[in-house]
């Protein structure tokens, strides 16, 4: 079983006096149910409902009174609950009972002693039904595919995981960690694929898992698409969209289709609500807060590199190239960095991820990511080579008068360089190995002390 880092966030939530019912969001098969089963070990009593099962779902049909509903559940499950002890109620697949969604506010108001987590593999179907969670009465967490730290722990590399977590990797372990990070990018972070790989160390056995995941996503389309036309568009995206991962996209005629910009945009947003992808928009300013230019072309980031590699047939490239930056023209590297950064954002309850483009006619300057660190904006470029070749990064630093630190993610060792742009601006460049991306905030904290 994989130890998920979000357990720490759940533990913190459970200890808060002002705790609200928690809605755990995430794509299908990222491990939401398993995570809550692990988390439940911190409780004296654990009651688990699956609203896909009629016996569990009918509890919400007997009454509108949450105390009566809870009493019915306890009798049905043959569980005696002491309200002076810690009790967790997990409502899985809650999208199957809209009434259960509405009643979360009353559990919060009338039974605050009860810890409640709700989850579902198709929460986005509530959007289609025009049903929303009670405003101000619930809080949210998001679970993504496994991070690199979770990959290390799952593959019996706990000592290396601790080195990464503490940011004290000795140079002697650098090549080993880079090799493991490349393998993590190849396998991806979907729990079923990761557990299978951890048990036999054989990438060739994972194809049926990836195929099953893709089939499942395709089968779900009809449940949240608004009409038959959108079903076809979403299935087109799920077939051809993986080849655009880590790249700036154009909505109109996406993937060689005849679909309009509006049709593709709406379909991509449906998939974004399903946590299958993210549309990351650019910023043109270099100040806090970062405000995305949503009229510009976004980058397409899918939920998992392992599914991406399988879908577009580039798995062998990882075995042919020693550097991740050489795999699929560098797009795989940008995809996996985006995945790792997204996990950091989620665990810190931050939402949006951006990249930067220079707002100047005729300019092609673009920085892969911009990261808000406290009151500053930090540019992040995924690139190897000499410092002189980081022209877009130099352009950003020249534009951002108050910025004095930048990050280059690369396959080399950790170091910090003093760099001067051609225009004379001096700044510090953190050369960050791929395996440290998930520790970006702590790395920046140390660098800015």
Language-model regions, residue ranges each:
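N-terminal pre-Walker A segment at the start of P-loop NTPase domains
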Residues: 1-15
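A cross-kingdom feature that marks ATP-driven nucleic-acid transaction machinery
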Residues: 14-22, 29, 38-45, 79, ...
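Conserved lysine of the Walker
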Residues: 32
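Conserved catalytic segments around the Walker B and adjacent sensor/switch elements
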Residues: 42-56
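Short glycine-rich substrate-engagement loop in P-loop NTPases that contacts/grips substrate
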Residues: 53-85
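Structural recognition of the conserved hydrophobic beta-strand(s) that form the central parallel beta-sheet
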Residues: 115-121, 142
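Short regulatory helix/loop adjacent to the ATP-binding pocket of P-loop NTPases
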Residues: 124-140, 153-157
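Interdomain hinge/linker elements that couple catalytic modules in large macromolecular machines
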Residues: 153-336, 346, 359-362
């Amino acid at each position: 079983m994989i130890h998920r880092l979000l357990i720490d966030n759940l533990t913190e939530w459970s200890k808060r006096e002002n705790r609200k019912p928690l809605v755990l969001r995430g794509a299908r098969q990222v491990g939401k149910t398993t995570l809550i089963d692990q988390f439940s070990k911190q409780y004296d009593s654990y009651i688990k409902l699956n609203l896909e099962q009629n016996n569990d779902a009918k509890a919400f049909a007997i009454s509108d009174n949450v105390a009566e509903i809870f009493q019915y559940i306890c009798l049905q499950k043959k569980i005696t609950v002491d309200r002076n002890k810690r009790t967790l109620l997990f409502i899985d697949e809650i999208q199957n009972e809209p009434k259960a969604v509405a009643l979360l506010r009353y559990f919060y108001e009338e039974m605050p002693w009860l810890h409640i987590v709700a989850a579902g593999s198709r929460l986005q179907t509530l959007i289609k039904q025009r049903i929303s969670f009670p405003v101000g009465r619930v809080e949210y967490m998001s679970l993504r595919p496994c991070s690199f730290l979770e990959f290390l722990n799952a593959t019996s590399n706990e000592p290396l995981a601790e080195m990464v977590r503490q940011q004290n990797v000795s140079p002697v372990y650098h090549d080993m960690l880079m090799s493991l990070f490349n393998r993590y990018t190849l396998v991806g972070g979907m729990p079923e694929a990761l557990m299978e790989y951890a048990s036999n160390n054989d990438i060739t056995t994972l194809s049926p898992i990836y195929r099953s995941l893709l089939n499942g996503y395709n089968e779900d389309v009809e449940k949240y698409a608004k009409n038959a036309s959108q079903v076809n568009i979403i299935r087109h995206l799920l077939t051809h969209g993986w080849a655009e991962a880590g790249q700036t996209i154009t909505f109109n005629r996406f993937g060689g289709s005849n679909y309009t910009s509006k049709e593709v945009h709406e379909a991509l947003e449906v998939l974004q609500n399903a946590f299958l992808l993210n549309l990351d928009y650019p910023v043109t300013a270099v100040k806090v807060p970062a405000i995305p230019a949503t009229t510009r072309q976004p980058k397409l980031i899918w939920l998992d590199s392992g599914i991406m590699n399988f879908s577009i047939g580039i798995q062998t490239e990882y075995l042919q190239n020693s550097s991740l930056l050489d795999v699929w023209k560098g797009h795989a590297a940008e995809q996996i960095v985006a995945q790792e950064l997204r996990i950091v954002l989620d665990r810190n309850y931050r939402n949006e991820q951006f990249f930067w483009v220079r707002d100047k006619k005729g300019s092609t300057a673009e920085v892969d990511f911009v990261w808000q660190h406290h009151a500053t904006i930090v540019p992040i470029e995924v690139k190897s080579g000499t410092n002189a070749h980081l022209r877009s990064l130099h352009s950003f630093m020249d534009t951002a008068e108050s910025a004095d630190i930048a990050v280059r993610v690369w396959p080399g060792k950790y170091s910090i360089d003093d760099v001067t742009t051609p225009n004379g601006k001096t700044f510090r460049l953190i050369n960050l190995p791929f395996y440290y991306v998930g520790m970006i905030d702590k790395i920046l904290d140390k660098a800015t002390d």
